[in-house]
Amino acid sequence: MRILFIVDPLSTFKIYKDSTFAMMREAAARGYAIYTCQQSQLTLSGNVVETVATPLALTGDEHDWYRSGDPRLLPLTGFDAVLMRKDPPFDMEYVTSTWLLEIAERQGARVFNKPQAIRDHSEKLAIAQFREFTAPTIVTRDAKRLREFHAEQGDVIFKPLDGMGGAGIFRVGADGMNLGSVIETLTHNGTRTVMAQQYIPAIRDGDKRILLIGGSPVPHALARVPMAGEVRGNLAAGGTGRAQLLSERDQVIAHALAPVLWQRGLLLVGLDVIGDYLTEVNVTSPTCFQEITQQTGFNVAGMFIDALERAAGKASGGLGRKLA
């Protein structure tokens, strides 16, 4: 099996916690060939979507962790699976990449997650499709509506629609301190749409990342507990990860969403759940594989590659494409 990973620069990888690295390591352990490219290398030429793909061999060393082979210009149809693992922001370059990947799909490439499904599921807005699991929420750039929402709820989280890692998230309490400044800053004076949600006190127990793989939930979540004085549990914002079994409510949410999202072409999804409420549906490059595995022994990457084998094999009727 030949797998192409579309990734950020390898120099940015922190392999002790990187989920893409965990995928690569599991694939390599099964004898699969690993190739990488960057988003900027995707090209449509002569109506064929191709990229400069670099073969990668993992060394097992913590620092000098890979050896690169000679880069080759190859069509995406030459791989058994193409994994889009580029981190947000989900900007127009990201959208353009999904268009190119969708063309490659029509040419026979097998791309995960499905490019159209990535576009169709804004990581913040997708929760609106599952309203029975969400806290009170408003999405607008109208300052008056945002102020009214705050007056109704009393304690509100404001966040941009295109952020990641907890960037740009603000809490405004019942006293309304800095409400105007937060609204002006996040909406860029009314020119950008934002989300506001009722503050959920259960954030003190962690923002739970629940992974859905191939239509099934991983049995353990990673509760990302905020550091003192913070409302953001994101690991990138200083939160601490604590693996735990899915609660009864977690399972209800996960089992309701997993088959629906898988049917839409989303092989890997990261749900964010605070207390009893779904807050985000992450579809670009969900993470937390290694933290869950290290704390529980459950092989998340193994479950993912198992699902990838089934998905790629089902799409092709068998594995083993030959590169030109």
Curated annotation (Swiss-Prot):
**Can you quote the record's cofactor note?**
Binds 1 Mg(2+) or Mn(2+) ion per subunit.
So, what pathway does this thing act in?
Sulfur metabolism; glutathione biosynthesis; glutathione from L-cysteine and L-glutamate: step 2/2
Q: Which InterPro entries match?
A: ATP-grasp, ATP_grasp_subdomain_1, Glut_synth_pro, GSHS_ATP-bd, GSHS_N, PreATP-grasp_dom_sf
Catalysed reaction equations from the record: gamma-L-glutamyl-L-cysteine + glycine + ATP = glutathione + ADP + phosphate + H(+)
Q: What class of enzyme is it?
A: ligase
- Under the GO molecular function aspect, what terms does this record hold? ATP binding; glutathione synthase activity; metal ion binding
Where Mg(2+) binds, per the record, is at E280, N282
Domain ATP-grasp: start-end pairs: 124-309
Superkingdom of origin: Bacteria
Coiled-coil region(s): none
Q: One Pfam family for this entry, by name?
A: GSH-S_N
Q: List UniProt keywords, sorted A-Z.
A: ATP-binding, Glutathione biosynthesis, Ligase, Magnesium, Manganese, Metal-binding, Nucleotide-binding
Single GO cellular component annotation? cytoplasm
Q: EC number(s) in its UniProt entry?
A: 6.3.2.3
Q: Where is ATP annotated to bind?
A: 150-206
Q: Which family does it belong to?
A: Belongs to the prokaryotic GSH synthase family.
What NCBIfam families has UniProt attached to this entry? Answer: glut_syn, PRK05246.1
HAMAP family (UniProt xref): GSH_S
Q: What is this protein called?
A: Glutathione synthetase
Q: Which organism is it from?
A: Ralstonia nicotianae (strain ATCC BAA-1114 / GMI1000) (Ralstonia solanacearum)
